[in-house]
Each structure stands twice: as structure tokens, then as C-alpha cells.
Regions:
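Charged, glycine-rich active-site and insertion segments that engage polyanionic ligands
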Residues: 1-28, 74, 82-244
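A short beta-strand-to-loop transition that corresponds to the Sensor-1 phosphate-sensing loop
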Residues: 52-53, 79-84
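Clamp-loader machinery-focused feature within the broader ASCE/P-loop NTPase space
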Residues: 1-72
Length: 244
């Protein structure tokens, strides 16, 4: 079981393993059936099966228990997850866990040679996230994060929810990736709290961390998660104002 933040290289590492051991490589997606899994167990072709558990709710993960507990001679299994939080305990108990260590800024710059500003390496801590950015898209996500942090206290509830329309839910490449947006909000909010001792920014920071953990599970409806996040941020900020 490979554990690490989105974009840290879990899929890349899986492909490297398959290549090094001369195994066929197959990713198992959400369309898999019990019949499919049985057929894989009967195959005589040495194959590395990669299961991204972020795409499966905990109840759905039950279908893999036999597959990972009783693999046949030609079956090799790598499970992937952003964290243990979204993995069924019975799956965890049947797995050998490997955690990807966090990258340093210097390692990221060596791995990802881009023209992005230095600040991008402070905010986004995995190669995959940085590779998904251009200078323009970095500015887009940072501007949106700054708008949330610095203007939420004057926004109406309806205006706060409008931010949800700027997020990419279905491969709309002119919009902002949800995970990148939450990373940027976390950075901007913490920086504002450290600089200005702003209690509202601290509450935005803490709320964002909680919702980042939910977003990392991957099997939630992103638009619903985003609306819940914006609602919560608006409420905590305006509660701070009313108590002031």
C-alpha cells in the first residue's frame, strides 16, 4: 500500500516497479466487477494490478479483500491512497504500508524544471501538482485563494458560494483544480495570520485543513464538498465578526 499526498508519484512508482520486474501493468478502475477480479486470479500472465483506493468508498473496498489476501502466483497488487483515513481497516491490516516522504523545496526544483515563481514551490509540495501548473494557472489559483481569504468578511453568503463556479469539476481546463485551490488558501490564510495576527485567517486556515483531508479521500462529490467548504468558511468568518 503506497501512501502519499496527491501528486507525490505513486502511479509513477507503480509503473517503475512493473517495468523493473517485467510485469504487465493494469490499473483497476471503478467499473471493476467480482467476475473481473476472479478472471485476474485465473490469469497466468505475471501482472501488476494497481488499485487507486481514492476512487473507491470504504464499502466498495470490501470487494478487494479476497483479491489482496489470496493472490495467485502471477498476481501482484499495489494499492494507492492519499492517506490511511479513506482506507478500510481490513484492507490496511492485509497490507504492507509504504509512506512517501515529503519533498523539500530543493528536491521539487530538481524534479520539476518550470518557470513557475518560487512561491509556487512553497505552496504546492508534490511534483504532480507543480507539473499541472503554468504561470497563468498559478496566478489564477493564487488570485482566487487571496480573494477568499481577504474578502470573505465582506461577502454575502450568496457571493461566497459563487467561488464554487470557478472550480474545475469535469475537466474544464480554464477553471481551478480543487486540491490546488485548497493548498493555496491554506498558504495564504496562514501567511495572513502570521503577518497580521488575523483571527479570521486562522479560522479559514483550520477549516481548510479539515476540508483538505476530506478532499484527499477522492471518492466524494467535489461540487458538494466545495459548497460545504465555502458555507463553513463564510459562517466561521462572520461568526468572528459578530463576536468582535
Amino acid at each position: 500500500l503506497l501512501l502519499g499526498e496527491k501528486g507525490c508519484g505513486k502511479h509513477t512508482f507503480a509503473k517503475f516497479i512493473a517495468q523493473q520486474f517485467e510485469l504487465e501493468y493494469k490499473e483497476i478502475d471503478e467499473q471493476v466487477t467480482a467476475t473481473d477480479l476472479d478472471s485476474y486470479l485465473l490469469s497466468t500472465i505475471d501482472t501488476l494490478y494497481v488499485i487507486d483506493l481514492n476512487n473507491f468508498a470504504e464499502k466498495q473496498q470490501n470487494q478487494f479483500l479476497k483479491f489482496i489476501e489470496e493472490p495467485t502466483k502471477s498476481v501482484y497488487v499495489l494499492l494507492l491512497a492519499n492517506s490511511e483515513a479513506g482506507v478500510l481497516n481490513t484492507v490496511l491490516n492485509r497490507s504492507i504500508k509504504h509512506h512517501f516522504e515529503a519533498y523539500t523545496d530543493e528536491q521539487l526544483k530538481q524534479l520539476v524544471n518550470t518557470t513557475l515563481p518560487a512561491q509556487a514551490y512553497e505552496i504546492f509540495k508534490t511534483p504532480g501538482k507543480l507539473l499541472n501548473l503554468t504561470e497563468d494557472s498559478f496566478k489564477q489559483v493564487l488570485d482566487l485563494a487571496e480573494k477568499l481569504v481577504h474578502k470573505m468578511h465582506t461577502a454575502t453568503f450568496a457571493n461566497a458560494l459563487v467561488i464554487s463556479t470557478k472550480i474545475n469539476y469535469k475537466d474544464l481546463f480554464d477553471k481551478v483544480d480543487l486540491n490546488l485551490f485548497l493548498d493555496a488558501v491554506e498558504f495564504v490564510a496562514l501567511d495572513d495570520y502570521k503577518t497580521n495576527n488575523n483571527k479570521q485567517s486562522l479560522d479559514i486556515f483550520l477549516t481548510t485543513i479539515k476540508f483538505k483531508q476530506l478532499a484527499s479521500l477522492g471518492n466524494l462529490i467535489k461540487e458538494t464538498l466545495m459548497l460545504n467548504y465555502l458555507s463553513t468558511v463564510w459562517e466561521v468568518v462572520h461568526n468572528d465578526i459578530s463576536r468582535a
